[in-house]
């Protein structure tokens, strides 16, 4: 099973916020996931990024690949070099 760390869109129409989730790459964007590891709200000033640091590090250590957008968020949160 190939697993990715990616964004799941939540919120009202035109007012998106996102959950950072670990999911099978074959699942649809807003479909089934394994675990919620964080939250991202681009609409606040400054944008809100909340991550469960221990769980993110665990999933990265077992080989989960983050998507490009999640990789940018992890860099902003100083969790990736």
Swiss-Prot record:
The keyword Aminoacyl-tRNA synthetase does not apply. It holds the Pfam family Ribosomal_S16. It comes from the Bacteria. GO terms for biological process: translation. GO terms for molecular function: structural constituent of ribosome. The keyword Repressor does not apply. One of its GO terms (cellular component) is small ribosomal subunit. Keywords: Ribonucleoprotein, Ribosomal protein. Belongs to the bacterial ribosomal protein bS16 family. This is Small ribosomal subunit protein bS16. It comes from Coprothermobacter proteolyticus (strain ATCC 35245 / DSM 5265 / OCM 4 / BT).
């Amino acid at each position: 099973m190939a697993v990715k760390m990616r964004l799941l869109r939540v919120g009202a129409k035109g007012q998106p916020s996102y959950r950072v989730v670990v999911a099978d790459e074959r699942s649809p964007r807003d479909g089934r996931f394994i675990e919620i590891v964080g939250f991202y709200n681009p609409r606040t000033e400054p944008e809100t990024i909340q991550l469960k640091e221990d769980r993110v590090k665990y999933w990265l250590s077992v080989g989960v690949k983050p998507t490009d957008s999640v990789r940018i968020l992890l860099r902003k949160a100083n969790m990736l070099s």
